[in-house]
């Protein structure tokens, strides 16, 4: 009898552990990043808010790892910042416009002054897009700091 109680207790415990990690995906916050086809679309977005741009490709392992980090930030700041994903394989002209050679490549444009983009770099603005790039897998902390800087500098 004691063995049956022990086995039953272990079985119930195993089932509880098995299902403890399951969650309902409908409660998870996910934010789809916008896609753009032209510089003009980016310019239109800049009229109302900073633009966070991630350049990547589905074939890139680091880009796949970057995606949930950016989606989490997009869910948090979507009402204050435009989040854009540009697939370099599909939009190679935009990748060339921003001199993208390595992916993922992330940068934030705070504003445009007389047609010149002002990128966020270390808490300040720069017109040098190369210096403002975050190339490779970038953790949430530096990305969030850059977003907050863009909002402050806007």
Protein language model annotation of sequence segments:
Residues 54-60:
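Aromatic-flanked redox-active Cys/Sec active sites in thiol-based oxidoreductases
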Residues 60-63, 106:
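The canonical Cys-X-X-Cys-His
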Residues 98-112:
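Structural micro-motif
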Residues 108-154:
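Non-catalytic, surface beta->alpha helical segment in thiol-disulfide oxidoreductase systems
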Residues 30-50:
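A short beta-strand-turn-helix
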Residues 33-36, 55, 74, 78-93, ...:
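Thiol-based oxidoreductase modules, predominantly thioredoxin-like and allied folds used
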Residues 40-41, 64-77:
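Typically the conserved alpha-helix immediately C-terminal to a functionally engaged Cys/Sec
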Residues 1-27:
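Secretory targeting signatures
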């Amino acid at each position: 009898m004691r063995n049956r109680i022990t086995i039953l207790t272990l079985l119930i415990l195993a089932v509880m552990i098995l299902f403890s990690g399951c969650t309902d995906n409908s409660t998870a916050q996910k934010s789809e990043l916008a896609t753009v086809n032209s510089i003009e679309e980016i310019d239109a977005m800049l009229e109302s808010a900073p633009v966070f741009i991630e350049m990547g490709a589905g074939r890139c392992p680091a880009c796949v790892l970057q995606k949930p980090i950016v989606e989490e930030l997009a869910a948090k700041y979507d009402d204050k910042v435009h989040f854009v994903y540009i697939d370099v394989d599909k939009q190679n002209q935009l990748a060339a416009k921003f001199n993208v050679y390595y992916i993922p490549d992330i940068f934030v444009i705070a504003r445009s002054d007389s047609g010149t983009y002002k990128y966020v770099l270390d808490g300040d603005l720069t017109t040098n897009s190369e210096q403002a790039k975050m190339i490779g897998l970038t953790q949430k902390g530096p990305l969030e700091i850059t977003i907050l800087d863009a909002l402050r500098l806007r």
